[in-house]
From Swiss-Prot:
It comes from Arabidopsis thaliana. Residues 251-302, 346-362, 419-452, 507-521, 575-592 are cytoplasmic. GO terms for cellular component: endosome; endosome membrane; extracellular region; Golgi apparatus; Golgi membrane; Golgi trans cisterna; trans-Golgi network. The keyword Transferase does not apply. Keywords: Endosome, Golgi apparatus, Membrane, Signal, Transmembrane, Transmembrane helix. It comes from the Eukaryota. A motif (Golgi retention signal) lies at residues 590-592. InterPro entries: EMP70, MFS_trans_sf. This is Transmembrane 9 superfamily member 2.
């Protein structure tokens, strides 16, 4: 058991040694009056389609001379960031009033392109000294008219920057579009446009260390916190009711069972051969498709470990707002470093299940989650390339990811598998397994797999569904989510409810003399992932304004992968809890 512990300690040391580096990634530059402060234009895109973003100069803005692309980290590229030097000169404490930076005659095609962008509510994003700036590129004047052909389309041509500074550091920046300085795009004709900008500087007492707090305050407002705490209380009540109910029922039932089975020598044959003790010779019979089962446990354990490490980094403040690409970088690195845990767990359990083809099992473990994720990525990346969107990964980034998988993930997976194979641990079964399996008696329909999965998934989902909206609005929208402590509490509640409901359903399954509980407990535990995917359908059609083939395919494609990951992770939690329970109750009776 030292191997997985060693791997966990190693991963933790690497991550927390790098945590300080990630946090200091925000610019700590000091400037003198007149110094150049880096300003990068990032991307543009429809406001309601967060995945459908394009390079800033894909729209026919004035392109300055010597445009330079910023060298980006892996996480920034995965996040769809494509930073280039912006056309504005915002030197430190250098004020400007209606400075013209470009005069341009827009052709008919450029007018059409801008009008289409304005119609779709295109916004732009920039970074000034690593502080984000947003704004819409234009507006639609509907003037209480219902006929879209009568709408008027305007392009903003004057942007007003207001920058706050504290001594020699930039603290805050905001951009406001001048509503009176517009270019009419309604008709298909050439238009003269004079683009200009204004810069105002104001001093503030806000320290540099707190300049990012502005972006996390929205999620910490009292009315938002009330909803979050209502979610926590709702979840806690669910947990208390569930655990109390199950504990009462199971303890009472098990107590009666133990008393009955303790007197089995005096009881009649028809009384002693009933219930879950009747199948003690079959309950530890290994499941079918043992290689797939072990691989699922290995992948689920890895994803559970990955989630814990992500929460640890979030709670120490690594994922502060607009730390570009930090989450994606952490996901890639931690997944690669924890692959040894998947290999060890899968191979050791597979050998306990008396499996012989451990190499094939290891290959299955490596592909079980990465395979569907890779196929989904290939399809969605092709869609993004077709749209020329920034979500399309460059060839170099794909090569880097393949190298990480080849040089880090795969070797660690193999090393973990070898360690698991050589652990020589035997499966601890309190009862001997008979040579031939008993026939399972006919069961009512509600004891079959699908109704049981529906019952098992509903309760854990009900404990997290309120928090899901805020997570979705952050991942697939423009909300900022920073209350990671509450999210971690919800995650712990999710794990507890999943474990308890799986244990209860496993007991009722065994009491009905159905000994095929291995896969059933895994499926019941993981069924919450199916409920989350069903919530995706509801969120897309009822709570969001997403549209278009690209955004739709990205949303449902990547959410399918995330829900599949939840299925594997929670399935592992459910099975582990059920295994502990089954071992406990059969260890408490005398098995022949």
């Amino acid at each position: 058991m030292r191997t997985p512990t060693t791997i966990l300690l190693l991963v933790g040391a690497i991550l927390f040694s790098g945590a300080g580096y990630v946090r200091s990634d925000a610019s700590d530059h000091r400037y003198k009056e007149g110094d150049t402060v880096p300003l990068y234009a990032n991307k543009v895109g429809p406001f309601h389609n967060p995945s459908e973003t394009y390079r800033y100069f894909d729209l026919p803005f004035c392109i300055p001379e010597g445009v330079k692309e910023k060298k980006e980290a892996l996480g920034e590229v995965l996040n769809g960031d494509r930073l280039v030097s912006a056309p504005y000169k915002l030197n430190f404490r250098d004020e400007k009033e209606s400075e013209v930076y470009c005069n341009k005659k827009l052709s008919k095609e450029e007018v059409k392109q801008f009008r289409k962008a304005v119609e779709k509510d295109y916004y732009f994003q920039m970074y000034y000294d690593d502080l984000p700036i947003w704004g819409f590129i234009g507006k639609v004047d509907k003037d209480i008219k219902s006929d879209p052909s009568e709408f008027k389309y305007f392009l903003y041509k004057h942007i007003q920057f207001e920058i706050l500074y504290n001594k020699d550091r930039v603290i805050e920046i905001s951009a406001r579009m001048d509503p009176h300085s517009l270019v009419d795009l309604t008709e298909d004709k050439e238009v003269d446009a004079e683009f200009m900008y204004t810069v105002k500087w104001k001093e503030t007492e806000t320290p540099f260390e707190k300049r990012m707090e502005k972006y996390s305050m929205s999620s910490s407002l009292p009315h938002h916190l009330e909803i979050h705490w209502f979610s926590i209380i709702n979840s806690c009540v669910t947990v208390l009711l569930l655990t109390g109910f199950l504990a009462t029922i199971l303890m009472r039932v098990l107590k009666n069972d133990f008393m009955k089975y303790a007197q089995d020598e005096e009881a009649a044959d028809d009384q002693e051969e009933t219930g879950w003790k009747y199948i003690h010779g079959d309950v530890f019979r290994f499941p079918t498709h043992n290689s797939l089962f072990a691989a699922s446990l290995g992948s689920g354990t890895q994803l559970f470990t990955l989630t814990i490490f992500i929460f640890m980094l979030a709670l120490v403040g690594v994922f502060y707002p607009y730390n570009r690409g930090a989450l994606f970088t952490a996901l890639v690195v931690i997944y690669a470093l924890t692959s040894g845990i998947a290999g060890y767990t899968s191979a050791s359990f597979y050998c306990q299940l008396e499996g012989k083809s451990w190499v094939r099992n290891l290959l299955l473990t490596g592909c079980l989650f990465c395979g569907p994720l890779f196929l989904t990525f290939c399809f969605l990346n092709t869609v993004a390339i077709t749209y020329t969107a920034t979500a399309a990964l460059p060839f170099g980034t794909i090569v880097v990811i393949v190298l990480i998988w080849t040089l880090v993930t795969s070797p660690l997976l193999v090393l973990g598998g070898i360690a698991g194979k050589n652990s020589k641990a035997e499966f601890q079964a309190p009862c001997r397994t008979t040579k031939y399996p008993r026939e399972i008696p006919p069961l009512p329909w509600y004891r079959s797999a699908i109704p049981q999965m529906a019952m098992a998934g509903f309760l854990p989902f009900s404990a997290i569904y309120i928090e899901l909206y805020y997570i979705f609005a952050s991942v697939w929208g423009h909300r900022i989510y920073t209350i990671y402590s509450i999210l971690f509490i919800v995650f712990i509640i999710l794990i507890i409810v999943t474990a308890f409901i799986t244990v209860a359903l496993t007991y009722f399954q065994l009491a009905a003399e159905d000994h095929q509980w291995w896969w059933r407990s895994f499926l019941c535990g993981g069924s919450t992932g199916l409920f989350i995917y069903a919530y995706c359908l509801y969120y897309y059609y009822a709570r969001s304004d997403m549209s278009g083939f690209m955004q739709t395919s990205f949303f449902f494609g990547y959410m399918a992968c995330i829900c599949y990951g939840f299925f594997l992770m929670l399935g592992t939690v459910g099975f582990r809890a059920a295994l502990l329970f089954v071992r406990h109750i059969y260890r408490s009776i005398k098995c022949e």
